Structure formats: C-alpha cells, structure tokens
Amino acid sequence: DRQTDRQSLIKLLQYVFGYAVVKLSDIATITRGGNFQKKDFCEEGVPCIHYGQIYTYYGTSASKTITMITQTAADKSKFAEPNDIIMAVTSENIEDVCKCVAWTGKNKIAVSGHTAILHHNQNAKYLSYYFHTSMFFSQKQKYAHGTKVIEVTPDKLNDVIIPLPSIAEQNRIVDILNRFDILCNDIVDGLPAEIEQRQKQYEYYRDKLLSF
C-alpha cells in the first residue's frame, strides 16, 4: 500500500544518502491528549503526565512520572505508550510551546489535555532532541497561532520536516547527546558563567548533530 511504499522509499534514501528528509506524518501518528485536571491527582493510582509538568519538570525524556490520577479519571483519559512523544501544544509564549518529553517507561501513562501524543517506531530520544533544536523552533514559529495563548495544532505538526537517519545512526547521535546532557546537568559547583558557556556548547553541538 501507499504507506508501505513510503517507508520503503525512506529506507532507500537512508541507505543511499545516510538520511531522509521526511514529514512528521510520514513516521508518526499524532493524536490529542485527554482531559484530566490537577484535581484528579491522587497518592496511589494511574501514572500520568500533566501538560504543565512538561514545561516545569521534565527534560527530553522520562521513565517515571511524578503524579498519578484516580482510576475514574484514567478511564476517561488518553494514554501514551512506551516510546511515544508527549508534546505540550499550548503555551503563553513561543519558547515553551511544543516542548516535549519522550516517554521511555515500560507501561502506558495517562496524558492530559493541551498535548499531542506522537506514536512512532523511531528512537524517541532522537525525535525529542530534534524538537529542542533551532531548526524545529523556526518551523513551530511558522505554524503557531494566537496572542495570549500560543498553540500549534496536531494538524500543523503533521507538516513538520525532520532529517531522519537510520535507527543505528539515531542511536549513535542519542548516545553522544545523552553524555553531553549529563555533563551539562550534573554540574553541582561552578560559576554561573561556566555553566552558561557549557549549556551554549551543548546546544551548538546538539544542533550540529541533528542537521544534515
């Protein structure tokens, strides 16, 4: 079928050129998150990620959640599967809209509203790192709308362009960025200027690794 032909073409381009330039819709199915609220949080229940936590707590990936919701709320919720990307699609500013986290836990989790869930079969951390680059930033600026509340709809996300190397190359890039990420974020002591410089170096090399 058409989708199988598209996947075969992507693999051929990856083999010949080392990567393929694809639309997000070529490699991912995008759905909206659920509708639970903070009042549904509880001590023991179903693990969840609320869209506000993507801005304030989570980094590029997570294997555990910091909150749970009641079973009643979960029964009406939407879920992210292991390896999915959870993206916050509304924000008060352009910098935070489309901030995302790769879910690397072993079980599915409930996801709140104001999110998009990206289901795919790529390296989730590779995609998450890409969604933090300046290349993606320029694209989301084009697709974002609103003034007080900025939004990028799942339909618009389908048109986002991504450079996609083979899974083996994605894994290699992720391994490098993971080590760089740890190096930057594990600094306990040091002058603020040094930490800021290290962060700039990390962002520079991340963008270089993810541009083809």
Identify the meaning behind each predicted range:
Residues D1-L9, G18-A20, N158-Q199:
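Amphipathic alpha-helical segments
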Residues D26-Q37, G52-D84:
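Sequence-specific dsDNA recognition surfaces
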Residues Y15-G18, N35-F36, A73-A74, T104, ...:
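Short, solvent-exposed loop/turn positions at domain surfaces
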